[in-house]
Protein backbone atom coordinates (compact mmCIF):
# COMPACT_ATOMS: atom_id res chain seq x y z
CA UNK A 1 0.00 0.00 0.00
CA UNK A 2 1.52 3.28 -1.13
CA UNK A 3 1.52 6.39 1.08
CA UNK A 4 -1.52 7.91 -0.64
CA UNK A 5 -3.59 4.78 -0.06
CA UNK A 6 -2.54 4.74 3.60
CA UNK A 7 -3.66 8.33 4.02
CA UNK A 8 -7.00 7.61 2.34
CA UNK A 9 -7.56 4.49 4.48
CA UNK A 10 -6.71 6.27 7.73
CA UNK A 11 -8.94 9.19 6.75
CA UNK A 12 -11.86 6.88 5.93
CA UNK A 13 -11.54 5.03 9.22
CA UNK A 14 -11.32 8.30 11.15
CA UNK A 15 -14.36 9.69 9.35
CA UNK A 16 -16.30 6.50 10.08
CA UNK A 17 -15.39 6.63 13.77
CA UNK A 18 -16.30 10.33 13.94
CA UNK A 19 -19.64 9.64 12.26
CA UNK A 20 -20.42 6.82 14.71
CA UNK A 21 -19.53 9.06 17.68
CA UNK A 22 -21.69 11.84 16.26
CA UNK A 23 -24.66 9.49 15.86
CA UNK A 24 -24.15 8.15 19.41
CA UNK A 25 -24.23 11.68 20.80
CA UNK A 26 -27.46 12.36 18.90
CA UNK A 27 -28.97 9.14 20.30
CA UNK A 28 -27.96 10.11 23.84
CA UNK A 29 -29.46 13.57 23.38
CA UNK A 30 -32.74 12.16 22.00
CA UNK A 31 -32.94 9.63 24.85
CA UNK A 32 -32.30 12.33 27.44
CA UNK A 33 -34.98 14.64 26.04
CA UNK A 34 -37.47 11.78 25.68
CA UNK A 35 -37.00 10.62 29.26
CA UNK A 36 -37.15 14.18 30.55
CA UNK A 37 -40.56 14.80 29.00
CA UNK A 38 -41.77 11.27 29.59
CA UNK A 39 -41.70 11.81 33.37
CA UNK A 40 -44.60 14.25 33.08
CA UNK A 41 -46.93 11.70 31.50
CA UNK A 42 -48.86 8.76 32.88
CA UNK A 43 -50.47 6.08 30.77
CA UNK A 44 -53.94 5.28 32.08
CA UNK A 45 -54.59 1.62 31.30
CA UNK A 46 -58.33 2.07 31.73
CA UNK A 47 -58.93 4.32 28.72
CA UNK A 48 -55.46 4.40 27.13
CA UNK A 49 -55.31 8.19 27.49
CA UNK A 50 -52.27 10.20 28.47
CA UNK A 51 -52.89 11.97 31.77
CA UNK A 52 -50.77 14.82 33.17
CA UNK A 53 -49.02 14.18 36.46
CA UNK A 54 -50.22 16.94 38.77
CA UNK A 55 -48.07 17.63 41.84
CA UNK A 56 -51.10 17.21 44.14
CA UNK A 57 -51.53 13.62 42.97
CA UNK A 58 -47.99 12.49 43.79
CA UNK A 59 -48.09 10.29 46.85
CA UNK A 60 -44.37 9.50 46.96
CA UNK A 61 -41.33 10.36 44.89
CA UNK A 62 -39.43 7.44 43.38
CA UNK A 63 -36.17 8.16 41.55
CA UNK A 64 -34.82 5.83 38.89
CA UNK A 65 -31.16 6.30 37.80
CA UNK A 66 -30.36 5.40 34.18
CA UNK A 67 -26.70 5.36 33.05
CA UNK A 68 -25.83 6.11 29.42
CA UNK A 69 -22.04 6.49 28.93
CA UNK A 70 -21.24 9.41 31.26
CA UNK A 71 -24.78 10.88 31.36
CA UNK A 72 -27.02 10.46 34.45
CA UNK A 73 -30.76 10.90 33.95
CA UNK A 74 -33.28 11.17 36.79
CA UNK A 75 -36.73 9.96 35.91
CA UNK A 76 -39.75 10.38 38.21
CA UNK A 77 -42.11 7.45 37.89
CA UNK A 78 -45.75 8.52 37.73
CA UNK A 79 -47.97 7.25 40.55
CA UNK A 80 -51.34 5.63 40.09
CA UNK A 81 -54.25 7.97 39.44
CA UNK A 82 -55.78 9.33 42.65
CA UNK A 83 -59.33 8.07 43.26
CA UNK A 84 -62.30 9.28 45.26
CA UNK A 85 -62.69 7.82 48.72
CA UNK A 86 -65.54 5.33 49.14
CA UNK A 87 -65.18 4.32 52.80
CA UNK A 88 -66.37 0.78 52.03
CA UNK A 89 -64.18 -0.98 54.61
CA UNK A 90 -65.82 -2.21 57.84
CA UNK A 91 -65.65 -0.25 61.07
CA UNK A 92 -62.75 -1.25 63.34
CA UNK A 93 -63.61 -3.31 66.40
CA UNK A 94 -62.46 -1.39 69.46
CA UNK A 95 -62.26 -1.83 73.23
CA UNK A 96 -62.01 1.88 73.97
CA UNK A 97 -59.95 4.94 73.10
CA UNK A 98 -56.24 5.78 73.36
CA UNK A 99 -54.57 9.24 73.49
CA UNK A 100 -53.55 10.59 70.09
CA UNK A 101 -52.83 14.35 70.13
CA UNK A 102 -52.94 17.50 72.29
CA UNK A 103 -52.00 20.98 71.04
CA UNK A 104 -51.61 22.91 74.35
CA UNK A 105 -52.58 26.16 72.61
CA UNK A 106 -53.54 28.09 75.75
CA UNK A 107 -50.39 27.18 77.69
CA UNK A 108 -48.27 28.21 74.70
CA UNK A 109 -50.20 31.48 74.41
CA UNK A 110 -48.69 32.61 77.72
CA UNK A 111 -45.40 33.20 75.93
CA UNK A 112 -46.08 33.15 72.21
CA UNK A 113 -48.28 34.45 69.40
CA UNK A 114 -51.12 31.91 69.22
CA UNK A 115 -54.52 32.57 67.63
CA UNK A 116 -57.67 33.01 69.70
CA UNK A 117 -60.05 30.27 68.51
CA UNK A 118 -63.13 28.25 69.22
CA UNK A 119 -65.19 25.55 67.47
CA UNK A 120 -62.20 23.30 66.64
CA UNK A 121 -62.37 20.01 64.76
CA UNK A 122 -60.18 17.41 63.07
CA UNK A 123 -60.32 15.89 59.60
CA UNK A 124 -57.89 13.80 57.56
CA UNK A 125 -56.90 13.46 53.92
CA UNK A 126 -55.65 10.02 52.77
CA UNK A 127 -52.19 10.73 54.21
CA UNK A 128 -52.37 13.22 57.09
CA UNK A 129 -54.72 14.59 59.72
CA UNK A 130 -55.34 18.30 60.18
CA UNK A 131 -56.87 20.42 62.91
CA UNK A 132 -59.24 23.25 62.12
CA UNK A 133 -60.73 26.03 64.22
CA UNK A 134 -62.54 29.32 63.79
CA UNK A 135 -60.09 32.11 64.57
CA UNK A 136 -61.10 35.46 66.04
CA UNK A 137 -58.78 37.54 63.87
CA UNK A 138 -56.33 38.07 66.73
CA UNK A 139 -53.72 36.40 68.87
CA UNK A 140 -54.33 35.96 72.58
CA UNK A 141 -51.69 38.45 73.75
CA UNK A 142 -53.36 41.27 71.80
CA UNK A 143 -55.95 43.80 72.94
CA UNK A 144 -58.20 42.67 70.08
CA UNK A 145 -58.70 39.46 72.08
CA UNK A 146 -60.96 41.37 74.48
CA UNK A 147 -64.59 40.25 74.27
CA UNK A 148 -63.89 37.31 71.94
CA UNK A 149 -66.70 35.39 73.60
CA UNK A 150 -68.90 36.47 70.67
CA UNK A 151 -69.51 33.78 68.04
CA UNK A 152 -70.16 35.75 64.85
CA UNK A 153 -67.95 38.60 63.64
CA UNK A 154 -66.64 39.48 60.15
CA UNK A 155 -63.08 38.91 61.37
CA UNK A 156 -63.46 35.20 62.03
CA UNK A 157 -61.65 32.87 59.64
CA UNK A 158 -61.22 29.12 59.28
CA UNK A 159 -57.70 28.07 60.31
CA UNK A 160 -55.96 24.87 59.18
CA UNK A 161 -52.77 23.23 60.46
CA UNK A 162 -51.36 19.73 60.65
CA UNK A 163 -52.74 17.96 63.70
CA UNK A 164 -50.68 18.83 66.77
CA UNK A 165 -49.43 22.16 65.40
CA UNK A 166 -50.95 25.08 67.35
CA UNK A 167 -52.40 27.96 65.37
CA UNK A 168 -49.34 30.23 65.20
CA UNK A 169 -48.92 33.42 63.16
CA UNK A 170 -47.94 31.44 60.06
CA UNK A 171 -51.19 29.47 60.08
CA UNK A 172 -53.16 29.39 56.85
CA UNK A 173 -56.52 31.17 56.87
CA UNK A 174 -58.59 28.98 54.56
CA UNK A 175 -61.66 31.21 54.27
CA UNK A 176 -63.83 33.79 56.04
CA UNK A 177 -66.14 31.92 58.40
CA UNK A 178 -67.94 31.95 61.73
CA UNK A 179 -69.34 28.49 61.02
CA UNK A 180 -67.66 25.77 58.96
CA UNK A 181 -67.13 22.19 57.87
CA UNK A 182 -64.30 20.54 55.91
CA UNK A 183 -63.65 17.17 54.29
CA UNK A 184 -61.36 15.54 51.71
CA UNK A 185 -62.92 13.52 48.88
CA UNK A 186 -59.69 11.69 48.04
CA UNK A 187 -58.58 14.27 45.49
CA UNK A 188 -58.93 17.67 47.19
CA UNK A 189 -60.27 19.53 50.22
CA UNK A 190 -63.78 20.92 50.39
CA UNK A 191 -64.41 23.75 52.85
CA UNK A 192 -67.90 25.04 53.69
CA UNK A 193 -67.57 28.53 55.14
CA UNK A 194 -70.46 30.61 56.53
CA UNK A 195 -70.12 34.34 57.19
CA UNK A 196 -72.12 37.57 56.96
CA UNK A 197 -75.07 39.14 58.74
CA UNK A 198 -77.18 36.94 61.02
CA UNK A 199 -80.25 37.59 58.87
CA UNK A 200 -78.55 37.19 55.49
CA UNK A 201 -75.41 35.05 55.76
CA UNK A 202 -73.57 33.37 52.88
CA UNK A 203 -72.12 29.87 52.72
CA UNK A 204 -69.14 29.63 50.35
CA UNK A 205 -68.05 26.27 48.95
CA UNK A 206 -64.30 26.17 48.34
CA UNK A 207 -62.84 23.14 46.56
CA UNK A 208 -59.16 22.59 45.82
CA UNK A 209 -58.43 26.16 46.85
CA UNK A 210 -61.02 27.75 44.55
CA UNK A 211 -64.46 29.19 45.23
CA UNK A 212 -66.85 26.97 43.26
CA UNK A 213 -70.35 27.67 44.61
CA UNK A 214 -72.32 29.54 47.26
CA UNK A 215 -75.76 29.69 48.85
CA UNK A 216 -77.49 32.40 50.84
CA UNK A 217 -79.54 32.20 54.01
CA UNK A 218 -82.93 30.56 53.38
CA UNK A 219 -84.62 31.43 56.69
CA UNK A 220 -82.82 34.67 57.57
CA UNK A 221 -81.86 33.42 61.03
CA UNK A 222 -78.18 32.47 61.39
CA UNK A 223 -77.37 29.99 58.63
CA UNK A 224 -74.97 27.51 60.24
CA UNK A 225 -73.32 24.16 59.65
CA UNK A 226 -71.61 21.28 61.44
CA UNK A 227 -68.43 22.64 63.13
CA UNK A 228 -66.82 19.28 62.33
CA UNK A 229 -65.92 17.25 59.27
CA UNK A 230 -68.31 16.56 56.42
CA UNK A 231 -68.13 13.19 54.61
CA UNK A 232 -67.45 12.35 50.95
CA UNK A 233 -68.34 9.01 49.33
CA UNK A 234 -67.36 8.34 45.71
CA UNK A 235 -66.98 12.05 45.01
CA UNK A 236 -70.25 13.19 46.61
CA UNK A 237 -69.84 15.16 49.83
CA UNK A 238 -72.70 15.74 52.26
CA UNK A 239 -73.04 18.60 54.72
CA UNK A 240 -75.90 19.31 57.15
CA UNK A 241 -76.92 22.97 57.41
CA UNK A 242 -79.57 24.67 59.56
CA UNK A 243 -81.19 28.10 59.33
CA UNK A 244 -83.77 29.22 61.86
CA UNK A 245 -84.45 29.38 65.56
CA UNK A 246 -81.92 27.92 67.99
CA UNK A 247 -84.71 27.23 70.49
CA UNK A 248 -87.68 26.48 68.24
CA UNK A 249 -88.57 25.15 64.83
CA UNK A 250 -85.74 25.56 62.32
CA UNK A 251 -85.19 24.64 58.67
CA UNK A 252 -82.49 21.99 58.22
CA UNK A 253 -81.26 20.92 54.79
CA UNK A 254 -78.71 18.38 53.65
CA UNK A 255 -76.55 19.57 50.77
CA UNK A 256 -74.90 17.20 48.30
CA UNK A 257 -71.73 18.60 46.77
CA UNK A 258 -69.46 17.34 43.99
CA UNK A 259 -66.07 19.03 43.57
CA UNK A 260 -67.45 22.12 45.28
CA UNK A 261 -70.67 22.35 43.26
CA UNK A 262 -74.06 21.91 44.95
CA UNK A 263 -75.80 19.15 42.97
CA UNK A 264 -78.81 18.50 45.22
CA UNK A 265 -80.50 19.80 48.38
CA UNK A 266 -82.74 17.56 50.51
CA UNK A 267 -84.93 18.77 53.38
CA UNK A 268 -84.68 17.05 56.74
CA UNK A 269 -87.26 14.28 57.11
CA UNK A 270 -88.01 11.74 59.82
CA UNK A 271 -88.83 12.27 63.48
CA UNK A 272 -86.00 14.59 64.58
CA UNK A 273 -87.48 17.88 65.81
CA UNK A 274 -84.39 20.09 65.92
CA UNK A 275 -81.01 19.43 64.32
CA UNK A 276 -77.78 21.41 64.37
CA UNK A 277 -74.00 20.98 64.80
CA UNK A 278 -73.98 17.42 63.47
CA UNK A 279 -71.01 15.07 63.93
CA UNK A 280 -71.00 12.87 60.81
CA UNK A 281 -69.19 9.69 59.84
CA UNK A 282 -69.19 7.38 56.79
CA UNK A 283 -71.44 4.34 57.13
CA UNK A 284 -71.09 2.86 53.66
CA UNK A 285 -72.91 3.29 51.36
CA UNK A 286 -74.34 6.29 53.23
CA UNK A 287 -73.49 8.87 55.87
CA UNK A 288 -74.69 8.94 59.48
CA UNK A 289 -74.76 12.00 61.73
CA UNK A 290 -75.27 12.47 65.47
CA UNK A 291 -76.48 15.99 66.18
CA UNK A 292 -77.66 18.51 68.77
CA UNK A 293 -81.32 19.14 69.57
CA UNK A 294 -81.31 22.62 71.07
CA UNK A 295 -85.08 22.75 71.51
CA UNK A 296 -86.80 19.66 72.91
CA UNK A 297 -84.37 16.84 73.63
CA UNK A 298 -81.27 16.03 75.64
CA UNK A 299 -81.14 12.78 73.68
CA UNK A 300 -79.22 13.25 70.45
CA UNK A 301 -80.85 13.22 66.99
CA UNK A 302 -79.63 10.78 64.34
CA UNK A 303 -79.64 11.78 60.66
CA UNK A 304 -79.17 9.05 58.02
CA UNK A 305 -78.18 10.26 54.55
CA UNK A 306 -78.53 8.13 51.41
CA UNK A 307 -75.87 9.42 49.03
CA UNK A 308 -77.26 7.56 46.00
CA UNK A 309 -80.88 8.75 45.98
CA UNK A 310 -80.56 11.82 48.26
CA UNK A 311 -83.16 10.48 50.72
CA UNK A 312 -83.01 11.42 54.40
CA UNK A 313 -84.29 9.78 57.59
CA UNK A 314 -83.92 10.89 61.18
CA UNK A 315 -84.59 9.62 64.69
CA UNK A 316 -82.87 9.73 68.10
CA UNK A 317 -80.16 7.65 69.80
CA UNK A 318 -81.95 4.92 71.77
CA UNK A 319 -79.63 4.95 74.78
CA UNK A 320 -81.31 6.09 77.99
CA UNK A 321 -77.91 7.43 79.06
CA UNK A 322 -78.26 10.59 77.00
CA UNK A 323 -75.43 12.60 75.48
CA UNK A 324 -76.36 16.29 75.64
CA UNK A 325 -75.74 18.91 78.32
CA UNK A 326 -77.80 19.95 80.26
CA UNK A 327 -79.58 16.65 81.00
CA UNK A 328 -81.28 14.78 83.80
CA UNK A 329 -79.25 12.39 85.94
CA UNK A 330 -78.81 8.88 84.55
CA UNK A 331 -81.50 7.37 86.78
CA UNK A 332 -84.13 9.81 85.51
CA UNK A 333 -83.09 10.33 81.88
CA UNK A 334 -84.73 8.45 79.02
CA UNK A 335 -84.79 7.97 75.27
CA UNK A 336 -87.11 5.89 73.13
CA UNK A 337 -85.41 6.07 69.73
CA UNK A 338 -87.98 8.01 67.72
CA UNK A 339 -88.69 11.30 69.48
CA UNK A 340 -87.05 13.97 71.64
CA UNK A 341 -87.29 13.17 75.35
CA UNK A 342 -88.43 16.67 76.40
CA UNK A 343 -85.91 16.62 79.24
CA UNK A 344 -83.90 19.85 79.64
CA UNK A 345 -84.03 20.24 75.89
CA UNK A 346 -83.32 23.98 75.74
CA UNK A 347 -79.62 24.70 75.14
CA UNK A 348 -77.07 22.00 74.52
CA UNK A 349 -73.56 21.31 73.30
CA UNK A 350 -72.09 19.74 70.17
CA UNK A 351 -71.25 16.07 70.72
CA UNK A 352 -70.92 12.69 69.04
CA UNK A 353 -71.74 9.00 69.16
CA UNK A 354 -71.47 6.09 66.73
CA UNK A 355 -73.18 2.74 66.33
CA UNK A 356 -71.40 -0.57 66.92
CA UNK A 357 -73.85 -3.28 65.96
CA UNK A 358 -76.72 -2.98 68.45
CA UNK A 359 -74.53 -0.99 70.84
CA UNK A 360 -73.42 2.64 70.83
CA UNK A 361 -70.18 4.38 71.76
CA UNK A 362 -70.62 7.93 72.99
CA UNK A 363 -68.92 10.84 74.69
CA UNK A 364 -70.36 13.57 76.92
CA UNK A 365 -69.50 16.06 79.65
CA UNK A 366 -69.27 14.54 83.11
CA UNK A 367 -71.32 17.40 84.53
CA UNK A 368 -75.06 17.17 83.88
CA UNK A 369 -75.44 20.96 83.84
CA UNK A 370 -72.21 22.55 82.59
CA UNK A 371 -69.40 21.99 80.12
CA UNK A 372 -67.09 20.41 82.68
CA UNK A 373 -65.25 17.10 82.51
CA UNK A 374 -65.52 14.58 79.69
CA UNK A 375 -66.17 10.84 79.58
CA UNK A 376 -66.67 8.10 77.01
CA UNK A 377 -68.36 4.72 77.30
CA UNK A 378 -70.27 2.01 75.45
CA UNK A 379 -73.97 1.35 76.05
CA UNK A 380 -75.03 -2.24 75.42
CA UNK A 381 -78.12 -2.17 73.20
CA UNK A 382 -77.81 1.60 73.04
CA UNK A 383 -78.37 1.71 69.30
CA UNK A 384 -81.36 -0.62 69.02
CA UNK A 385 -83.05 -0.99 72.42
CA UNK A 386 -85.20 1.89 73.74
CA UNK A 387 -83.95 3.42 77.00
CA UNK A 388 -81.03 1.00 77.36
CA UNK A 389 -78.69 1.94 80.22
CA UNK A 390 -76.07 -0.80 80.63
CA UNK A 391 -72.76 1.08 80.50
CA UNK A 392 -69.34 -0.57 79.99
CA UNK A 393 -65.77 0.51 79.20
CA UNK A 394 -66.09 3.97 80.73
CA UNK A 395 -63.07 6.27 80.40
CA UNK A 396 -62.40 9.71 81.83
CA UNK A 397 -60.84 12.03 79.26
CA UNK A 398 -61.04 15.24 81.30
CA UNK A 399 -61.73 15.13 85.03
CA UNK A 400 -64.83 16.88 86.35
CA UNK A 401 -62.83 19.72 87.96
CA UNK A 402 -61.73 20.99 84.54
CA UNK A 403 -63.57 22.61 81.66
CA UNK A 404 -64.44 20.93 78.37
CA UNK A 405 -66.65 22.15 75.52
CA UNK A 406 -67.68 20.97 72.07
CA UNK A 407 -66.66 17.52 70.86
CA UNK A 408 -66.95 15.73 67.56
CA UNK A 409 -66.01 12.68 65.54
CA UNK A 410 -63.66 12.07 62.63
CA UNK A 411 -62.83 8.89 60.73
CA UNK A 412 -59.46 7.45 59.69
CA UNK A 413 -59.15 4.72 57.06
CA UNK A 414 -56.65 1.99 57.87
CA UNK A 415 -55.46 -0.97 55.81
CA UNK A 416 -58.39 -3.20 56.76
CA UNK A 417 -60.94 -1.07 58.62
CA UNK A 418 -62.18 2.44 59.41
CA UNK A 419 -61.31 3.77 62.84
CA UNK A 420 -63.38 6.32 64.75
CA UNK A 421 -61.64 9.14 66.58
CA UNK A 422 -62.89 12.15 68.52
CA UNK A 423 -61.66 15.51 69.75
CA UNK A 424 -62.66 17.53 72.81
CA UNK A 425 -62.59 21.32 72.87
CA UNK A 426 -61.02 22.61 76.10
CA UNK A 427 -62.45 26.11 76.56
CA UNK A 428 -60.70 28.70 78.72
CA UNK A 429 -61.38 32.33 79.62
CA UNK A 430 -64.75 34.03 79.74
CA UNK A 431 -67.49 33.57 80.87
CA UNK A 432 -66.34 31.41 83.77
CA UNK A 433 -62.80 32.81 84.19
CA UNK A 434 -63.35 36.54 84.55
CA UNK A 435 -59.74 37.47 85.35
CA UNK A 436 -59.17 37.60 81.59
CA UNK A 437 -61.16 39.24 78.79
CA UNK A 438 -60.66 36.60 76.12
CA UNK A 439 -62.28 33.24 75.31
CA UNK A 440 -60.23 30.57 73.51
CA UNK A 441 -59.48 26.85 73.52
CA UNK A 442 -57.03 24.02 73.07
CA UNK A 443 -57.91 20.45 72.03
CA UNK A 444 -57.23 16.87 73.00
CA UNK A 445 -57.72 13.98 70.56
CA UNK A 446 -58.29 10.25 71.12
CA UNK A 447 -58.72 7.35 68.67
CA UNK A 448 -60.30 3.93 68.92
CA UNK A 449 -58.04 1.05 69.93
CA UNK A 450 -58.41 -2.73 70.00
CA UNK A 451 -55.67 -2.94 72.60
CA UNK A 452 -55.53 -2.25 76.31
CA UNK A 453 -55.25 1.20 77.87
CA UNK A 454 -54.76 2.94 81.19
CA UNK A 455 -56.34 5.92 82.92
CA UNK A 456 -55.68 9.63 83.20
CA UNK A 457 -57.04 13.13 82.66
CA UNK A 458 -55.99 15.51 79.89
CA UNK A 459 -57.32 19.01 80.69
CA UNK A 460 -56.15 22.22 79.04
CA UNK A 461 -53.69 22.74 81.87
CA UNK A 462 -53.01 26.49 81.63
CA UNK A 463 -52.71 28.45 84.89
CA UNK A 464 -55.08 31.36 84.27
CA UNK A 465 -53.03 33.55 86.63
CA UNK A 466 -50.04 33.27 84.28
CA UNK A 467 -52.04 34.23 81.20
CA UNK A 468 -52.26 37.65 79.51
CA UNK A 469 -55.40 39.50 80.56
From Swiss-Prot:
Residues 31-469 are virion surface. Its main location: virion. It is an enzyme of class 3 (hydrolase). Keywords: Calcium, Disulfide bond, Glycoprotein, Glycosidase, Host cell membrane, Host membrane, Hydrolase, Membrane, Metal-binding, Signal-anchor, Transmembrane, Transmembrane helix, Virion. Residues 91-469 are annotated as: Head of neuraminidase. Residues 1-9 are intravirion. N-glycosylated. Ca(2+) binds at residues 293, 297, 324. It catalyses: Hydrolysis of alpha-(2->3)-, alpha-(2->6)-, alpha-(2->8)- glycosidic linkages of terminal sialic acid residues in oligosaccharides, glycoproteins, glycolipids, colominic acid and synthetic substrates. One of its GO terms (molecular function) is metal ion binding. GO terms for cellular component: host cell plasma membrane; membrane; virion membrane. The keyword Acyltransferase does not apply. The chain crosses the membrane at residues 10-30. Residues 11-33 are annotated as: Involved in apical transport and lipid raft association. GO terms for biological process: carbohydrate metabolic process; viral budding from plasma membrane. Residues 36-88 are annotated as: Hypervariable stalk region. Homotetramer. Intact N-terminus is essential for virion morphogenesis. Possesses two apical sorting signals, one in the ectodomain, which is likely to be a glycan, and the other in the transmembrane domain. The transmembrane domain also plays a role in lipid raft association. Catalyzes the removal of terminal sialic acid residues from viral and cellular glycoconjugates. Cleaves off the terminal sialic acids on the glycosylated HA during virus budding to facilitate virus release. Additionally helps virus spread through the circulation by further removing sialic acids from the cell surface. These cleavages prevent self-aggregation and ensure the efficient spread of the progeny virus from cell to cell. Otherwise, infection would be limited to one round of replication. The influenza A genome consist of 8 RNA segments. Genetic variation of hemagglutinin and/or neuraminidase genes results in the emergence of new influenza strains. The mechanism of variation can be the result of point mutations or the result of genetic reassortment between segments of two different strains. This is Neuraminidase. The gene is NA.
